[in-house]
């Protein structure tokens, strides 16, 4: 099924393809950036994400190795998606940006050990 992923102001919008049973892999990450964002990441394939609005206002944030790509809306500041360093062919999406997913209802969200995957520790 196709779901709409939108930032808070609605100026960045993407279509994400997820199975009928829902996002199969989701997690929190404890790397220095993700723990500060505090969001839940849904993992989808590279062919399951299509940006449909806001390409010009979408901003890129990179740090350390500059391999991972973290995207956010330059108007409202909401992080919408990323391309992780460990596998740049997949997308990590902010599942709170999909209106009909209740992130507060998710129980036992696993934690990815991104802190120990980083090359530099703060």
Role assignments for model-derived ranges:
Residues 1-120:
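A short Gly-Trp-Pro
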């Amino acid at each position: 099924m196709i779901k709409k992923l939108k930032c808070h102001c609605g100026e960045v919008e993407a279509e994400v393809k997820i199975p009928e049973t829902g996002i199969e892999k989701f997690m929190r990450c404890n790397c220095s950036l993700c723990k500060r964002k505090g969001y839940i990441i849904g993992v989808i394939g590279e062919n399951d994400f299509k940006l449909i609005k806001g390409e010009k206002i979408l901003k890129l944030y990179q740090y350390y190795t500059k391999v991972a790509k973290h995207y956010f809306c330059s108007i409202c500041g909401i992080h919408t998606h990323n391309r992780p360093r460990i596998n740049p062919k997949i997308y990590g999406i902010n599942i709170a940006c999909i209106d009909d997913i209740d992130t507060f209802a998710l129980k036992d969200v696993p934690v990815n050990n991104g802190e120990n995957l980083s090359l530099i520790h703060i």
